[in-house]
Amino acid sequence: DPIRDIEIINVELIMSDLEIIQNRIGKIAKKCESSKDKKDLFELETLRKCEEALLQNKSLRRVDLNEDELLLLKSFCLITLKPIIYMANVSEDDAIIGHNQYTDKVREYASNENSSVIVVSAKMESELAEMNDDDKKAFLEEIGISNSGLDKLIYATYDLLGLQTFFTSGKDECRAWTFRKGMKAPEWCAGIIHSDFQRGFIKAEVMSFEDLKEYGSELKVKEAGKMRLEGKDYLMQDGDIVYFRFNV
């Protein structure tokens, strides 16, 4: 019973969070009796809201918390507040289909907390790990699957954490860089590579991976007018290929 297994683990995590919350409540409640400070009162109210949910065996990610409450709770590193992905290990046949009666139950359970479920066959993944890229691609096409379970997990994890990728290319190497959605080109993305890029940012020369894939070369992308010059307010997009212009 996968739901039973999930709940056994969740109870342990809930008890861990409950201990942290109740220890803090014991301290802040005494302080609130004398100070009546608004920040302390807000903290106490938020912690008691969490305590009530945990006592009902409810993970904190299932509790409706606003931005201020989430910001306050961030410092406590509460496990059940963290986003989660459920991975269901199934047979090879069920992995090809994409579900079975048990994964359907897990998906229903996960939907109540806005979590996702990745269905994989550990046996199949082990076999794929031994293949080269061409053999792996041919095998997946033969069984009608676009991505391996491991690839699906990576994509889901990136999405869950709000991460995306941009690329840089030079004479010696091509590199992928991870950034958070909503980052601006000079503000953070250039700085990921080197602080000088951020400090002396002038412009970003940008083309998309999809355009490069379609036209076949950087020159043809430029000829098609798909290469762009972006300034300091440009929000980086997933799959951007970037040449940073800077001067320090």
Spell out what each predicted region is.
Residues 22, 27-237, 242-248:
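C-terminal-of-GTPase-core extension/linker across diverse P-loop GTPases
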Residues 1-14:
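Conserved P-loop NTPase nucleotide-binding/switch module
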